Amino acid sequence: MTQPDMSQILAQAQQMQAKLQEAQREILATTVTGTAGNGLVSIDMQGNGMVSSVTIDPKVVDADDVETLQDLLVGAFAEAHEKLGTLAEQKMGPLSQGFDGLGGMF
């Protein structure tokens, strides 16, 4: 088996780094929305995981039933978080496979 040229390996590594950085920028520039209760509660989450807005339909605001609202908020947050994880996997996953092409060094 022929060893790959070190300059080739470095060039490939630099390309991978640039692609990873671009994917990270795309993720950070994205906002995902998680909803619960058929849209009664929604949470917008930025690519860095910070919540940027929460929308609550007045129909679910009931002082006698705070638990339902809490459950809806948790559900909307969980959905937004899951969407963000899926986005990161879609953007970064294919790039991690590129390490196989670096001469088997990784």
From Swiss-Prot:
It is found in: Cytoplasm, Nucleoid. The keyword Cytoplasm applies. Homodimer. It comes from Corynebacterium diphtheriae (strain ATCC 700971 / NCTC 13129 / Biotype gravis). One of its GO terms (molecular function) is DNA binding. GO terms for cellular component: bacterial nucleoid; cytosol. Keywords: Cytoplasm, DNA-binding. Binds to DNA and alters its conformation. May be involved in regulation of gene expression, nucleoid organization and DNA protection. This is Nucleoid-associated protein DIP0260. The lineage of its organism: Bacteria, Bacillati, Actinomycetota, Actinomycetes, Mycobacteriales. Belongs to the YbaB/EbfC family. Coiled coil: none annotated.
